[in-house]
Amino acid sequence: LILFGSVSCVDNDNIGPIEKVNFLQFDFPQGNALWDKEIEQIAKDWGMYIIYKNVDSTHLNRMWTIPYYTDPIYVCSEPSSEDIQIYLDLVQEWLLGSLDKTKEEDKKQLPYYLYLVNDLNDGNPQSQTYQKRHIQFKKDGLDYWSLSFTSEELAAGLTPEIIHSVACAFSYPSLKVRFETKEYK
C-alpha cells in the first residue's frame, strides 16, 4: 500500500510522447553494394528488413518460450557477396512478386526480419536433430524468417527442384491472405 502511494505521487508532468522507437538489432543498410539499395527499398515498401550480415545463434534462437537443453540451437554461416544476389532474386520474384505492396493485409504476412544465411542447421549436440539436416526455410522465429541454402547448393547452382521448393514456401503468405480476404473462394 505504501509503495502504491509513493508511485502514484510521482510527478509525471515531464513525460511526453515518444517520437520514434528503433527496434532494429542490426546496422541497416548492411553495406553499400547495389543489392543494399534494393534491400533498403524493400524495407521502405514492405516493412521487412533483409539481413545477411552478423546473424548468429542469438538471433536465430529468439522465441516465445524458454527452450529445453535438448531443443535445437540453430546456427548458420554468412553468405558470400555472390550469394546475396541469388537470395535476393528469389525473394523479389517468389515472395514479394506474389504480394501487393498497396495492400496492408499483404504487408502483414511478412516478418520484421528476413535472414539470408548459409548452412542453417541444428548445432546443439544434445538435440535429436543435431546436424542431421539443413533447414532451407524457417518461419517459426519470434520476429523473423530465414532462408538458407547449403554452400554446396550455391556453388553448384540452385536446381529447379530447390527453386520450386522455395517458390512453394514463399507463395503461402499471398495465398493465405487472398483466402482470408475472400479474394479467392
Map each language-model feature to its residues.
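Acidic/polar, low-complexity intrinsically disordered N-terminal segments immediately downstream
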Residues: 9-98
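Active-site recognition of the HExxH zinc-binding catalytic motif
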Residues: 143-185
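General structural signal for secondary-structure boundaries
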Residues: 76, 80, 100-106, 155-162
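Auxiliary, metal-adjacent structural segments of Zn-dependent hydrolase domains
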Residues: 83-142
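Generic structural motif recognizing short loop/turn segments at the entrances and edges of beta-strands
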Residues: 46-47, 58-62, 108-113, 140-145
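C-terminal motif of bacterial Sec signal peptides marking the signal peptidase cleavage site
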Residues: 4-8
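Short loop/turn segments at strand-loop or loop-helix junctions that form parts
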Residues: 63-69, 117-119, 146-150
